[in-house]
């Protein structure tokens, strides 16, 4: 195994030199988009520091899954995941877990590869308690209703154009200056009828929709 370890170390060093000036860039993502585009969505706790896998360009974090929110069909009879895999270097969008609190629970939206959970710096991965009550509710049972049917369409500059009635115009970046705005925190893009999707409020005590955004001619 030593030759493979030496080769992997050499490759890591070479890539770090090549990519040292390149930072990982991630596009803003609405939580619903993160849910729908992920193979797996779980709640889990990180149990320690990452372990470098010498024969690959990856490292892995030991995790303790507390609840699976998406991915039941994909994992089959698997009862959980012990590790989350990520690129070993930040320049390759490797995820770096900074919290030292092993009792803190995180929402992890990742990909399934060869039966393993994979995450990157661009993955939707946040402390569960940092999510709004509406987001927590949506990750458990609401976002799934829009997957494959509706699309959150980012608006990063005015004017914005909708390409389909199944799109919901996401304007948080324009109106709030951040992707963590009102639509992200409190709304989901859901079907109103077979040919139309609209923003729908995720509050517990009331249900209302944002005004429909009209596409430019």
UniProtKB/Swiss-Prot annotation:
**Pfam families from the xrefs?**
TIMP
Q: How is it modified after translation?
A: The activity of TIMP1 is dependent on the presence of disulfide bonds. N-glycosylated.
Positions of the NTR domain:
24-147
Cellular component annotations (GO), alphabetically ordered: basement membrane; extracellular matrix; extracellular space
**Which factors induce or repress this protein, as stated in its UniProt record?**
By follicle-stimulating hormone (FSH).
Q: Which UniProt keywords apply?
A: Disulfide bond, Glycoprotein, Growth factor, Metal-binding, Metalloenzyme inhibitor, Metalloprotease inhibitor, Phosphoprotein, Protease inhibitor, Secreted, Signal, Steroidogenesis, Zinc
Q: What is its main location?
A: secreted
- Identify residues that carry Phosphoserine: 178
Q: In chain numbering, where does the site feature Involved in metalloproteinase-binding fall?
A: 37
InterPro entries for this protein:
Netrin_domain, TIMP, TIMP-like_OB-fold, TIMP_C, TIMP_CS
The entry annotates sugar attachment on: 77, 101
Q: Which PROSITE patterns match?
A: NTR (PS50189), TIMP (PS00288)
> Where found, per UniProt?
Secreted
Q: Does the keyword DNA damage apply?
A: no
* Gene Ontology biological process terms, A to Z: cartilage development; cellular response to peptide; cellular response to UV-A; connective tissue replacement involved in inflammatory response wound healing; negative regulation of apoptotic process; negative regulation of catalytic activity; negative regulation of endopeptidase activity; negative regulation of membrane protein ectodomain proteolysis
* S-S bonds: 24-93, 26-122, 36-147, 150-197, 155-160, 168-189
> Which segment of the chain is annotated as a signal peptide?
1-23
Residues that hold Zn(2+) according to the record: 24
Question: What sections of the sequence does the record tag as coiled-coil?
Answer: none
Task performed by this protein: Metalloproteinase inhibitor that functions by forming one to one complexes with target metalloproteinases, such as collagenases, and irreversibly inactivates them by binding to their catalytic zinc cofactor. Acts on MMP1, MMP2, MMP3, MMP7, MMP8, MMP9, MMP10, MMP11, MMP12, MMP13 and MMP16. Does not act on MMP14. Also functions as a growth factor that regulates cell differentiation, migration and cell death and activates cellular signaling cascades via CD63 and ITGB1. Plays a role in integrin signaling.
Write down the PANTHER family for this protein, in alphabetical order: METALLOPROTEASE INHIBITOR (PTHR11844), METALLOPROTEINASE INHIBITOR 1 (PTHR11844:SF20)
What's the family? Answer: Belongs to the protease inhibitor I35 (TIMP) family.
Assembly: Interacts with MMP1, MMP3, MMP10 and MMP13, but has only very low affinity for MMP14. Interacts with CD63; identified in a complex with CD63 and ITGB1.
State what protein this is by name: Metalloproteinase inhibitor 1
Q: What is the lineage of its organism?
A: Eukaryota, Metazoa, Chordata, Craniata, Vertebrata
């Amino acid at each position: 195994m030593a030759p493979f370890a030496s080769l992997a170390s050499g490759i890591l060093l070479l890539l770090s030199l090549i990519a040292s000036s390149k930072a990982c860039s991630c596009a803003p993502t609405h939580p619903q988009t993160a849910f729908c585009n992920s193979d797996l969505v779980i709640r889990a706790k990180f149990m320690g520091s990452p372990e470098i896998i010498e024969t690959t360009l990856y490292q892995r974090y030991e995790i303790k899954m507390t609840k699976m929110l998406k991915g039941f069909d994909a994992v089959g009879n698997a009862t959980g995941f012990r590790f989350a895999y990520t690129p070993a270097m930040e320049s390759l969008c490797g995820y770096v877990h900074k919290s030292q609190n092993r009792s803190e629970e995180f929402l992890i939206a990742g990909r399934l590869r060869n039966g393993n959970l994979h995450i990157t710096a661009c993955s939707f991965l946040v402390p569960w308690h940092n999510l709004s009550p509406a987001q927590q509710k949506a990750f458990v049972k609401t976002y799934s209703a829009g997957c494959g049917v509706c699309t959150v369409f980012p608006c990063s500059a005015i004017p914005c154009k909708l390409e389909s009635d199944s799109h919901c115009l996401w304007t948080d970046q324009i109106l709030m200056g951040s992707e963590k705005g009102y639509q992200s925190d409190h709304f989901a893009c859901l079907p109103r009828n077979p040919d139309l999707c609209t923003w729908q409020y995720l509050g517990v005590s009331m249900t209302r929709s944002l005004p429909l955004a009209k596409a430019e001619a």
